């Protein structure tokens, strides 16, 4: 039995579709091999809601569309020695960033006041709701990101390659065949 310390890995999802986490599951049975070397900290895959302050690797999918996303990202970065941006939304804002060419007020007006079928529409003003940002931002605009796994979503093989390279003490390198957008 190995006495090597397992690395703590945390994952979270911000403004995205959760497709990157689904790709994480596409590692399939190799997850069992991975679990010999890592333990999950905060992750929707495990339903653990908090990140310990000594997490080795943090993986984030999704961009930043509201104040809560920014807060979660900063706390996550503070607790993780290595931070990986996973997927197009985390790396460049992805599909949510398509709203960036319109003012936020125009978008809110369309969604809550002028959309077909709305009667007596009003823009929510509830302190429990996170404040939307004027634009969607990729995570590297707010915190330092150590590695990027591109794709929409990235393949399970790409995620596997980055994690196994890091576990082996190597700089992750994704070959041409591992980077794609489905």
Where are these regions (language model features)?
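Iron-sulfur-associated redox domains of electron-transfer enzymes in respiratory
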Residues: 1-182
